[in-house]
Each structure stands twice: as structure tokens, then as C-alpha cells.
Design a protein with these regions (language model features):
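Short coil/linker segments at helix-helix boundaries
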Residues: 165-185, 236-266
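Membrane-proximal, proline-rich intrinsically disordered regions
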Residues: 18-72, 247-248
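Polar, glycine-rich mid-to-C-terminal structural blocks
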Residues: 232-234, 266-350
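Flexible, polar/acidic helix-loop-strand segments at domain edges
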Residues: 84, 88-99, 349-430
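Short coil/turn linking the two alpha-helices of tandem helical-hairpin repeats
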Residues: 158-162, 167, 206, 232-239, ...
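Conserved, well-structured interaction surfaces
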Residues: 32, 36-45, 49-55, 59, ...
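Structural register within alpha-helical repeat arrays
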Residues: 145, 152, 219, 226, ...
Length: 452
């Protein structure tokens, strides 16, 4: 059977892969793989179209009912409360927050399928690169193969992190009968070792900057992911999480630059590489999330967004804001996601010691747009009530207004789809997180973490 591949003309120019497809450009496999350029586009670049997404359970961030929600709405950071007739959704969000999801959860299954779909696409890309290696130079094939392996490692990281014991499939033609589950520790080792092997062949470039390497996995992206694996090694190396016994990170070893280090030392060393590469904390915190945030000195890995080029979407501001809030910005909104009361307490909301970053991350109290106060349809001012949040707000006088709402990203007033297609790149990895990882690793290794 001939596989059908898509070539996007815009993809040749941007090399990001996250592009709208033109159905007229579909070609057979033999037609597609006719040059080095086409081989790159159809075996490497196309994979980046799956890091973001435009539909439910697709993309690592930006959409709903997928990786982001299962890593956020299941924590004490955020929740989507039931607001009368809104947001019950068959108990989806309530079950997420209260950890009552089951194996029959449709959205979780769709997330699983999405992650493994990309893994299998990577496996096929590796086979294609080998089959058509005569079209490109040896250095190009080595570089592209390394990049595909890095993308696959990234997705296996999320699979391993979310699901634990999972099938580890590394070829495109493995019969279903041969697929078996691998221990979580094995998948952890696979991801780390893959990144270690391909690291010398990844570009030593910033991935968040527009240009040839924009949105791609480069060497700093791999360092960051490896550091995250090392920091969480006690969890990932634990194949029996029911016995109450966890491995000791000081005894879990990783290789960095050919040297064996314990998990905490490895994490510290990898974070130091990011510092040496030139990453810094952005002097103005909010600049990391500007409409045009490609110049950030802090962002390590982002999902490129451009409403005129990419189909990737970013739903979270739209999903969080009250209807009147969205209307005041010239669009719509869903009045859903809110920060938990615990999050408010962490930020010191309403206290003399309130974190200065609070106003950049949340809407609370009255809301003003362009100097005008946002009003409800009743004629009363919109007032968000952060401390009135609970799982089920039905019947509460704050049914529609409880909870602080997401801000963080600068509002793109020229965005499409009621704000779901802005130009702000979605930030996946930041240097600030690397500093926190380094500090934690140092403390766990017996130091005080003060030099992080």
C-alpha cells in the first residue's frame, strides 16, 4: 500500500512543520521523496505539526482535554468548576480535579492515541530516512535522524510521565502481537539515552527564535528535558509505586559528557549547560508571554503560533474569561478555568506580601479594558471572586464569577477565533524552571541550593 504524504509550500520557507495543509498538495510516497528538501519536509518537518494542535486532546499545550489539562486540572493549581448548567460535561472536570478518572475516560484515551500516533509517525520517519538516504548527504541524514529520535524521545517522555508502564515501540512495522508493556524505568532510560546519543548531532541553537531552528528540538531543548528526567528519577525509576518504597536519587546514575553522576548531580550539570549557553531570566517577567515573544532570553522551547500561517491554537485565555470579559475584548469566551484557592494562598493574594507577579498571571476583582470597567449584562460591574471557588458552584451567588482567571499571556487584540489563534508562542520550557530544578537538585544532594 502506498502511503499518502502532504507537502506544504509554506513549510519549505518556515521549516517549522506546523502549517495548514493544502489538500491539492497530496502526493504518493514515491512522488514525495524525490529530493533532499522533500525528504526533510516529509520525514522531519511534518512531525512538528503535532507538537501544537487545534482540536481536543491534540498538542502538548494549547488545546483542551489533553496533555495540558491532565497535568494541570488534576493538581492544586487550577480547576474548572461546575457553574450551574455549565461545565458539568459528564463529570469530566470534577473527576479530573478529584482524581476520579478511570480507564474508560474518553479524553484520556484520545490523549493516549495522540501521543502514540506521533511516536509511530517518528518510527515511520526513521524508516523513510533510511530508505531514501541516497537523496541527502551523510551529515544531513545523521542530523535529521537525530532530530526525529529527539522528537520521539520528547513524546515518550510525556507518555512515560503520564501513564507509567507503557509499550516501548521503536520500529514502524512491529506486529501488534509483539507489543508488550515496558517498565517505567526502562522507558525513562530509553528517553534519556536517546537524547544522550543524539545530542552531539542536534543544532547548538536557540529554538525559540525565528529562523531555521524555530520551534525545533535543538541541543538546549534536549538538555532541559534530560534535566527534568534526572530531577524526577526517583519517581520514574520506581516500577512498583504501590509499596511505599522509592529509589534514592543519589543512587540513580546518569551519564553527562561521558561522566557517571547521580540524578541530582546530573540535573545540576545539565541546568548549568543552559546557563553557559546564555539563557537568562527575562528582566521583565511578562515579556516572556508577549504577543511577539520570540525575542525572550528565557524561553527555551515554544510552540510557534502565527494566526496567518499555523493552525495551532491557544484556548486557555478564551476558556477562562467571563463572557462579558471576552465581549469587552471584541470576542467571546467560555467562563471556565479558575485558579484554585491554594494557588491564591501561594501568591499571597490580598495580603501585604502578595507576589508582584500575581497581576501578570491572574484577573481578580474588577476588570478594566482600555480604561473602561467591564460590566455584566445586568449592568453591574464584573468582579471576579478568587476565594469563593469550589468544585460545584451551582446555586452560589458567585456561580459565574468565582475564581481568579488566567492572564499571563498578553492579549492579542488582532487574534482570530475569539482569541484562540493569537501570535503569542506557547511557552513549554523556560530557563526559570531550569533554575528551580537546579536548586531542588542541589538541596536533595545535600547543599542549600543558594547558588542556583
Amino acid at each position: 500500500m502506498k502511503r499518502i504524504l502532504a507537502i506544504s509550500a509554506i513549510g519549505i520557507l518556515t521549516l517549522s512543520g506546523c502549517l495548514k495543509e493544502d489538500s491539492r498538495s497530496y502526493l504518493t510516497q514515491e512522488q514525495a521523496f524525490t529530493s533532499a528538501q522533500n525528504l526533510y519536509i516529509n520525514s522531519v518537518a511534518l512531525l512538528y505539526g503535532y507538537i501544537g494542535g487545534s482540536g481536543d486532546s491534540q498538542g502538548l499545550q494549547g488545546t483542551c482535554r489533553g496533555v495540558y489539562d491532565y497535568n494541570t486540572m488534576t493538581t492544586d493549581e487550577a480547576m474548572i468548576p461546575i457553574r450551574g448548567g455549565d461545565w458539568y460535561d459528564g463529570g469530566l472536570w470534577e473527576n479530573m480535579y478529584q482524581h476520579k478518572w478511570t480507564s474508560s475516560d474518553a479524553s484520556l484515551y484520545e490523549t493516549w492515541k495522540y501521543l502514540y500516533k506521533v511516536v509511530m509517525l517518528c518510527n515511520q520517519s526513521l524508516a523513510d530516512l533510511q530508505a531514501y538516504s541516497h537523496l541527502a548527504s551523510e551529515d544531513e541524514i545523521r542530523s535529521w535522524t537525530s532530530e526525529v529520535r529527539a522528537v520521539r524521545a520528547l513524546f515518550y517522555f510525556y507518555i512515560m510521565d503520564m501513564f507509567g508502564r507503557v509499550p516501548l515501540v521503536t520500529a514502524a512495522d512491529v506486529p501488534v502481537s509483539d507489543v508488550v508493556q515496558s517498565e517505567r524505568s526502562e522507558v525513562m532510560r530509553f528517553v534519556y539515552d536517546e537524547l544522550t546519543e543524539v545530542l552531539p548531532h542536534l543544532a547548538p541553537e536557540r529554538s525559540n527564535r525565528q529562523g531555521k531552528w524555530y520551534g525545533r528540538i535543538t541541543r538546549p531543548v534536549a538538555w532541559f528535558l534530560m534535566a527534568k528526567i534526572a530531577l524526577n528519577a526517583e519517581v520514574y525509576a520506581d516500577d512498583d509505586w504501590t509499596d511505599g518504597i522509592r529509589p534514592d536519587g543519589s543512587q540513580v546514575m546518569f551519564e553527562v559528557d561521558g561522566i557517571q553522576m547521580n540524578a541530582w548531580e546530573a540535573c545540576t550539570s545539565l541546568c548549568d549547560k543552559l546557563e553557559s549557553f546564555g539563557y537568562l531570566l527575562e528582566p521583565v517577567y511578562s515579556d516572556n508571554f508577549l504577543v511577539h515573544n520570540e525575542g525572550s532570553v528565557e524561553n527555551v522551547f515554544t510552540i510557534p503560533l502565527d494566526k496567518n500561517l499555523y493552525r495551532n491554537q491557544f484556548w486557555y485565555l478564551f476558556r477562562s474569561r467571563h463572557y462579558s470579559h471576552g465581549g469587552a475584548l471584541g470576542g467571546a469566551s467560555e467562563n471556565g478555568t479558575s485558579a484554585t484557592i491554594h494557588t491564591m494562598e501561594v501568591y499571597g493574594y490580598g495580603t501585604p506580601g502578595q507576589d508582584a507577579r500575581f497581576v501578570h498571571n491572574f484577573y481578580a476583582g474588577e476588570v478594566f479594558i482600555d480604561g473602561s470597567q467591564v460590566m455584566l449584562h445586568t449592568g453591574e460591574p464584573l468582579v471576579y471572586m478568587p476565594m469563593e471557588l469550589k468544585v460545584n458552584l451551582t446555586g452560589s451567588p458567585y456561580e459565574k464569577t468565582a475564581g481568579a482567571r488566567m492572564a499571563k499571556y498578553e492579549v492579542d487584540r488582532k487574534s482570530f477565533s475569539d482569541g484562540r489563534q493569537p501570535d503569542n508562542d506557547i511557552v513549554l520550557f523556560r530557563y526559570a524552571d531550569a533554575l528551580l530544578m537546579k536548586a531542588e537538585a542541589q538541596v536533595r544532594n545535600g547543599a542549600d541550593g543558594s547558588d542556583a
